[in-house]
Each structure stands twice: as C-alpha cells, then as structure tokens.
C-alpha cells in the first residue's frame, strides 16, 4: 500500500513539474495571447523555400502563439501568377501575411493590385528577402510602396555586420549590438519610401554605403515589417534571425 502511495506521489509531482515547465515556456513567448493565424506565401526563383518555410514556421511558432498556413505555388521561375489572389477575400482568414516569394518578372498591374489593395486596406505583413525583388520589372510602384523600399539588385554574399540604430523600437528588443549574418546577400536600397523607418543597416563592402536591412513601413492602414536578409538556409538556422522575424510578425499584428 505504501509503495502505491509513493508511486502516486511521484507521478503527481512529475505532472505538476511538466505543467510548470509548460507554463514557463508560455511566459517566455513573445506573444502568448489568443492564437494568431498567419499565411506564408512562398515560392519562385533562387532559394530553398521548402527548408525556409519549415524553419520559419516552426521557429516562430515556438516564440509566438501563431498557426501558419503555407502556400508554395508558382514553380521555381521568375514569372508566375498564383490562383490564391483570384479570390478577393484571399487574406480574410488571417491576422498577418508573410511574403517570402521571388517572382521578379511578373509585371501585370492588375494582378499586383489584387495583392497590394488588400494590404493597403489594413492587412498587416512581413516581407522577407526576395519579396523586395518580386515584381521589380513592373512599371507601377504599388508593390514598392507596400514594401517601403525599392531595391533592384544585390551585392555579393558575405557575412555582413548588422548595426541597429533604432534600439528603442520593440522589434529590436534584445537584438545584439552587432549581429553578423551567416553568408547572405546585401540588397542595394535605391529608395526608402516616406512612410518607412529603418531599424538597422549594413555597410556595402564595395562602396561603403549604408543600406537599410531591417525596417518598418505603414501602407495605408497596415503595418509592414521587412528585412532584406534571408537568402541562405544558414540565415534561417540562426536564432537571432528567427527571433527578429518573430518580433516583426508580432509587431505587424499589433501584438507587441
């Protein structure tokens, strides 16, 4: 009888410890309120989007109470129009949209406006790496206004120091004084749009110019968080980068 009581006590203690650990993990999350719904749109040229999607969603879900839906369509070329946007309510089920796609040569203005009009009406977004070169051949500026930056080219791959200069912004909380990226591409920023605010920069090894690499933007009534880094698998393995994306997503959704 005594042995049964001891076993039961040990069992209860283990369960209490497990519950306490779970609660501790929840408290450490950047956001642990009502579960957010996020849509990740990915696909296109030049990147390992299958790996990136897994690293991004699993990494952010550890830090934020969020559930991802992933749409990877359009193939691996530079030109595509995905059927998602044919539905005018394509973004309605989601609290925030993550763009990590690469379709530089898609130029149809009506197609592009199907995307940007939804964001301008208030749907928050996170934009990563080649999203900045997506639709770059288009004549209209709608996508670039949405991003908050204009970029048409990048420099060589290197390990670039990232220097924060908006340290008081909640997205940058806990960001290292100088984070050095894994091998990644530095995007040349030709223009910062009026409603965008840089949060960190890197310096070109070729020209010595500073280029914004992390920023926020207001597009219509939507919050947009962006970073030009995210080319390599190694970047998506870096906990500093995943934490940055998690904080950026939470901020865009007005939960930070």
Put a short name on every predicted segment.
Residues 43-46, 157-159, 231-238:
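Active-site rim elements
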Residues 40, 51, 55, 110, ...:
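Extracytoplasmic/secreted proteins, especially bacterial periplasmic and envelope-associated proteins
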Residues 18-22:
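Boundary at the C-terminal end of the N-terminal hydrophobic targeting segment
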Residues 104-174:
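A glycine-rich, often tryptophan-bearing local segment used as a flexible ligand/cofactor-contacting loop or short
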Residues 23-35, 62, 92, 206-211, ...:
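Extracellular ligand-binding/catalytic regions of CAZymes and related secreted enzymes
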Residues 30, 37-41, 49-127, 131-133:
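Helical hinge/lid and interdomain linker segments adjacent to catalytic or ligand-binding clefts
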């Amino acid at each position: 009888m005594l042995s049964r009581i001891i076993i039961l006590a040990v069992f209860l203690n283990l369960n209490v410890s497990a519950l306490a650990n779970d609660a501790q993990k929840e408290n450490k999350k950047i956001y642990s309120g009502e579960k957010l719904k996020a849509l990740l749109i990915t696909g296109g040229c030049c990147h390992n989007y299958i790996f990136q999607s897994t690293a991004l969603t699993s990494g952010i879900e550890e830090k934020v109470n969020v559930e991802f839906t992933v749409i990877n369509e359009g193939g691996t070329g530079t030109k595509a129009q995905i059927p998602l946007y044919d539905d005018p309510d394509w973004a309605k089920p989601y609290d925030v949209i993550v763009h990590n796609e690469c379709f530089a040569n898609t130029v149809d203005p009506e197609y592009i406006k199907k995307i940007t009009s939804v964001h301008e009406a208030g749907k928050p977004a996170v934009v990563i790496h080649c999203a900045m070169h997506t639709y770059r051949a288009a004549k209209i500026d709608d996508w670039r206004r949405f991003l908050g930056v204009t970029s048409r080219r990048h420099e060589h791959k290197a390990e670039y120091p990232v220097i924060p200069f908006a340290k008081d912004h909640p997205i940058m909380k806990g960001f290292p004084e100088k984070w050095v990226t894994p091998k990644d591409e530095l995007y040349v920023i030709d223009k910062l749009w009026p409603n965008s605010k840089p949060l960190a920069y890197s310096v070109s090894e070729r020209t010595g110019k500073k280029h914004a690499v992390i920023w926020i933007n207001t597009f219509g009534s939507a919050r947009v968080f962006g970073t030009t880094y995210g080319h390599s698998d190694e970047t998506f393995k870096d906990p500093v980068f995943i934490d940055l994306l998690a904080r950026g997503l939470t901020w865009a959704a007005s939960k930070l």
